Design a protein with these regions (language model features):
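Solvent-exposed interaction surfaces and binding hotspots enriched for charged
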Residues: 2-153
């Protein structure tokens, strides 16, 4: 049986969820920024409402916090400090769309930095694990003991 549409009712069309839209725009910004910073800035120019800009920021903040969790402790602490500074920039631009756009670009740049740091940390960890495995194999064969004895005299 078809639904009865009453006068003044949209027939099931709903407004987009502002949080979901903010997350989508944040993802778009993160896709654009590494390749074309001008296009990334232009994508934010199309957002005029402070509320919508703040939802994009919420999306970026969620990504940044998630990315930072994968960093070594010292880098994670530095990332937390940078997040505090980004919060100060956001607060200073609370009602200024142009200032909020600058905040969003800086927040997106921070995420790119976090990803770069995470990738570097993963490479270093993999290298350390490889070195440790080689060292353990050498010790098991007695090679390291002979090498250590030769260098300690």
């Amino acid at each position: 049986m078809p639904r009865l549409i009453r006068p003044g009712h949209s027939g099931g069309v709903t407004a987009p969820d502002p949080a979901a839209e903010g997350h989508r725009r944040a993802a778009d910004l993160l896709t654009l920024l590494p390749h074309d910073s001008t296009a990334a800035a232009a994508s934010l120019e199309g957002i005029s409402e402070v509320r919508d800009l703040v939802f994009v920021g919420a999306g970026l903040t969620a990504v940044a916090r998630s990315e930072a969790r994968g960093l070594p402790p010292a880098q994670r602490a530095q990332a937390n400090t940078r997040q505090l500074r980004l919060g100060e920039l956001r607060d200073a631009s609370r009602s200024d769309p142009a200032g909020l756009r600058i905040w969003l670009l800086r927040a997106a740049e921070e995420i790119l930095l976090l990803r770069s740091q995470r990738d570097t940390a993963e490479r270093v960890t993999a290298s350390d694990q490889e070195w440790t495995a080689l060292r353990a194999a050498a010790e098991a064969n007695g090679t390291a003991a002979a090498s250590d004895a030769a260098t300690s005299t």
